[in-house]
């Protein structure tokens, strides 16, 4: 698997799994009916943000990640990242590989920390992955997410230093 900067030509390969993940309504705070145009603007924003893809040897896009400042101005030294793995590639280490790549990129860009603002507490695979990579839960929004099957569940704020 290769991880590289996403190009506009990758979008048609990202959109189908991104659309399905968001429409499921279980892990992202985006509108479940997000349009392709809205999603492209959110997922592939201009610099200083960057988007990467994990690509199989056959050219299939297995997953994608976005790295950006968590806040602007005096808060721009803390990074934020988002990750989506194609369901067909789940359990194959794609998320971990994307995370390692993004953490390295954030360090290289001079970020001092990384923060995830809204990790759905019932997304246990993600929570376990982030904990294994040194992230800690530093905050909790009680019932901050409407899960389609589980009702109101907590959102976690997760953080780790990069220096």
Model-derived segments and spans:
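Conserved acetyl-CoA-binding loop of GNAT-fold acetyltransferases
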Residues: 131-140
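A short beta-loop-alpha structural element at the N-terminal edge
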Residues: 2-14
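Helix-loop element at the rim of GNAT/NAT acetyltransferase active sites that forms part
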Residues: 11, 16-33
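Conserved acetyl-CoA-binding loop-helix of GNAT-fold acetyltransferases
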Residues: 91-108, 127-132
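Active-site acidic-Proline motif in GNAT/NAT acetyltransferases
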Residues: 85-88, 92, 120-122
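Conserved GNAT acetyl-CoA-binding A-motif
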Residues: 106-119
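Acetyl-CoA-dependent GNAT
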Residues: 8, 31-88, 99-100, 105, ...
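Conserved beta-strand-loop-alpha-helix junction that forms the acyl-donor binding cleft
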Residues: 116-126, 144-146
